[in-house]
Amino acid sequence: VQLFLVVAGFAPGFGYDKYTTHIQNGNPYNLTVDMTPFIKINESYYVFGQTKVNWYVAYENCRRLQSELVTFETAEEFDAIAAFLNARGDRSEHWTSGNDLGKTGTHYWFSNAQLVTIKRWAPKQPDNAGGREHCIHLGYIYGYSTEFQLNDRPCHNHASSLFKYICEAPKQETVSIVVWK
C-alpha cells in the first residue's frame, strides 16, 4: 500500500494523465522475486533456523527477518513442512507460533490469533506437564514416534526446551500500475 501511495503521488509529475492500480494476493504473474534466505514450499516461504533457542529468541529471530514463527493454518501446510523436513532427513524439533500464554489450555497461533485447530498433536498432548508447558513445537515427540507431531513445552530456557525454529514470510501481494500517457 505504501508503494501505491508513493507512485500515485509522483505519477502526475512524470506526465501521466491516467493511471490505475490493482492489488492481487500472491504472485499471479510468476515474477522472479529473490526471497533469499526463504525457501518456497507450496505457496508460502519459510526459513528453517538451525540454532537451538528458546521460544522467545526464536520469535525474535523470525521478526529480524520480517517474518513470524510458523502458523499451521491447515493440515496440508503442516504435512508439506513435515514432508520437506523428512526429505532432508531432519528429525529435529522446531518451534511454531502456537502457545497458550494468554489462557492456559487454549492454544492460539501467536502470529494471527487464531485457535490451533489442526489435529496433529502427539498422543496425550498438549498436557502442560508441571504447569509450565505453554509453547508449541513440532517434532518426533516420543522415541516410538513415526511422524512429526505437535507438543507443548516450556517457552523459556528449560534444558529440554531449546529447539530449532521455522519462520514464515508474510503472504505476497502484487501491485500492478497501468499508466496512459
Regions found by a protein language model. Name each.
Residues 1-181:
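Extracellular, disulfide-bonded carbohydrate-recognition/adhesion ectodomains
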